[in-house]
């Protein structure tokens, strides 16, 4: 389990000092909860996020164990080093909005007909309780030919989950190569 510290000071000076010591600055928030300004060892955070098998994972901050989901992160544009991360507490029974990744399976038929596979949405916004949160949406693109696309309405959504994105938006498609 990932362990972090609660930041006493939230100023820029304190944040810079923590970053120099190898910490990643994080904000943890949730519906009806007080925001927690935390810091995690950057290498431990990256290891934990890479090895997680579900969208939500446990962190321990200030003696509390919280089940969180990565909402947003900021990277340095030059070094690609993580600078900041926002974590949302996934509370059981509380309906909230989450971004769920899209996994593409198969090879599109249109790729053999001089087409190019274009994934326009890498994550889809859903509204659900934490216990119904899917880890990812799997899309089979084997039947896609040049000019075809899979829309948000074509995604199979589990029970208890509602799609927030507009249903006419393309998720993945095959276009003619120029």
UniProtKB/Swiss-Prot annotation:
Residue pairs linked by disulfide bridges in the UniProt entry: none
GO CC term, one of those recorded: cytosolic large ribosomal subunit
Annotated GO MF terms: 5S rRNA binding; structural constituent of ribosome
GO BP: translation
Source taxon at top rank: Bacteria
Subunit structure: Part of the 50S ribosomal subunit; part of the 5S rRNA/L5/L18/L25 subcomplex. Contacts the 5S rRNA. Binds to the 5S rRNA independently of L5 and L18.
NCBIfam families from the UniProt entry: bL25_bact_ctc, PRK05618.1-4
Name the UniProt record assigns to this protein: Large ribosomal subunit protein bL25
Taxonomic placement: Bacteria, Pseudomonadati, Campylobacterota, Epsilonproteobacteria, Campylobacterales
Name of the gene this protein is made from: rplY
């Amino acid at each position: 389990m990932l362990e972090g510290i609660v930041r006493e000071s939230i100023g820029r000076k304190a944040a810079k000092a923590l970053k120099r010591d190898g910490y990643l600055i994080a904000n943890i928030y949730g519906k009806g909860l007080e925001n927690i300004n935390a810091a995690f060892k950057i290498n431990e955070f990256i290891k934990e996020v890479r090895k997680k098998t579900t969208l939500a994972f446990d962190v321990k901050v200030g003696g509390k164990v919280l089940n969180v989901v990565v909402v947003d992160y900021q990277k340095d544009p030059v070094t690609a080093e993580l600078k900041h991360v926002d974590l949302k507490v996934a509370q059981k029974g509380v309906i909230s909005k989450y971004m769920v990744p899209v996994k593409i399976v198969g090879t599109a038929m249109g790729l053999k007909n001089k087409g190019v596979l274009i994934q326009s949405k890498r994550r889809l916004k859903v509204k659900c309780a934490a216990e119904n949160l899917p880890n990812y949406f799997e899309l089979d693109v084997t039947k896609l030919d040049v000019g075809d696309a899979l829309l948000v309405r074509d995604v199979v959504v589990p029970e208890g989950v509602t799609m927030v994105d507009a249903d006419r938006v393309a998720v993945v498609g095959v276009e003619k190569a120029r």
